[in-house]
Amino acid sequence: MFYSVQLQWVVKEKVTAYGQNLTLFCPIENCCSKPAGWFVRSKTIIIDVKTFSNDPKVEYHGTHNKDGFGFVIRNLSEADLNVTYHCIYGFDQSTPKYLLHGDVFRESK
């Protein structure tokens, strides 16, 4: 039986300022038996989060657990906003979605 997984990434936790790390998360039950990756501006950044290097000098890194996989943007800057991101799992992929200011920052009280 063939079925398609509907992928949609979310911001895992909003930040308070530029310069912090921001994680985008693509929820998948029983992750990650298939390659799980990320695209930024239609460019492949991570082919598979399980094998991607987590070198602290690299702007991005990948995470995964049984509930899904993540994309960490280190040292968030304005250049990371208003561009499209999408996740891919096996042959399924999310629709490219813009990362907007309101998605990223916690509202000040």
Question: What name fits each language-model region?
Answer:
Residues 2, 59-65:
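Short, charged low-complexity linear segments at domain edges
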Residues 9, 24, 38, 58, ...:
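Hydrophobic beta-strand residues in large extracellular and virion-surface proteins
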Residues 76-79, 84-109:
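Extracellular/luminal immunoglobulin-like beta-sandwich modules
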Residues 16-25, 64-68, 74-87:
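Solvent-exposed loop/turn motifs of extracellular immunoglobulin-like beta-sandwich domains
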Residues 14, 45-47, 97-100:
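Generic detection of short hydrophobic beta-strand segments and adjacent strand-loop junctions
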Residues 15, 21, 31, 43, ...:
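Disulfide-stabilized cysteine-rich extracellular repeat microdomains
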Residues 25-59:
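N-terminal V-set
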Residues 1-12:
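N-terminal Sec-dependent signal peptide, specifically the hydrophobic helical h-region
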